[in-house]
Amino acid sequence: MKFRAKITGKGCLELFIHVSGTVARLAKVCVLRVRPDSLCFGPAGSGGLHEARLWCEVRQGAFQQFRMEGVSEDLDEIHLELTAEHLSRAARSAAGASSLKLQLTHKRRPSLTVAVELVSSLGRARSVVHDLPVRVLPRRVWRDCLPPSLRASDASIRLPRWRTLRSIVERMANVGSHVLVEANLSGRMTLSIETEVVSIQSYFKNLGNPPQSAVGVPENRDLESMVQVRVDNRKLLQFLEGQQIHPTTALCNIWDNTLLQLVLVQEDVSLQYFIPAL
């Protein structure tokens, strides 16, 4: 097994710093899935979708160099388990750097070596090297690391402005622990919370629905009908506060009374966060 990658350019370096920071804020331990065309972050363990979980893919276009050899020709992948904060801390040291290199090494034990090339104000180059301990996962547990295979959602809608959404959810989190998220195929979305003493509702309209949201919809379905899911407010707020990328596309997908999925896309990065219904 071999893996080596290099990131250069301010934009790509900042993107990787933000991605690793997002993963660290949402998971203590993660699985790094190295594929021929991408680097994927997933949750450790086999919890399924019974708890909030994050998957993130960084495609090959974000790297100047990307080379890997998997465990075999038929199984051309590598799965590494590591502490997410260790990778985030190493990536943060690349702020203002000229490059960041990732390499699978074996220094007494398997490690993910992160080498950062820095240039001082006097033009002198220096390297900072982080050796992060990893556990190479056996093939028998790979299936637990895959993102879920799901049918088309019952509703898919574009998210409102991030700061507005985060502010609303933060206020609701101070009132109660559960939030009801509703959306339809006509661009409307509602967030609501209700306790014995207070009821709060926030309405959004004209958000827009992605084109694929209409695929497979029965002809007789009322596009104004709302699909809903009640989720843990703290988990939703954790994602809204924790994610650090600047998405060009932000979607909310709902499986009625079953699952909430938030999808963010920025250039060569896609991020999915799943929150199960209560």
UniProtKB/Swiss-Prot annotation:
InterPro entries per the UniProt record, alphabetical: Cell_cycle_HUS1 (IPR016580), Hus1/Mec3 (IPR007150)
One cellular-component annotation, GO: nucleolus
GO biological process assignments: double-strand break repair via homologous recombination; meiotic DNA integrity checkpoint signaling; mitotic DNA replication checkpoint signaling; mitotic intra-S DNA damage checkpoint signaling; nucleotide-excision repair; telomere maintenance
Any Pfam family hit: Hus1
Tissue expression per record: Expressed strongly in testis, less in spleen, thymus, prostate, colon and leukocytes.
Subunit structure, as described in the record: Interacts with RAD1 and RAD9B.
Family annotation (PANTHER family): CHECKPOINT PROTEIN HUS1B, MITOTIC AND DNA DAMAGE CHECKPOINT PROTEIN HUS1
The family this protein is said to belong to: Belongs to the HUS1 family.
Name assigned to this protein: Checkpoint protein HUS1B
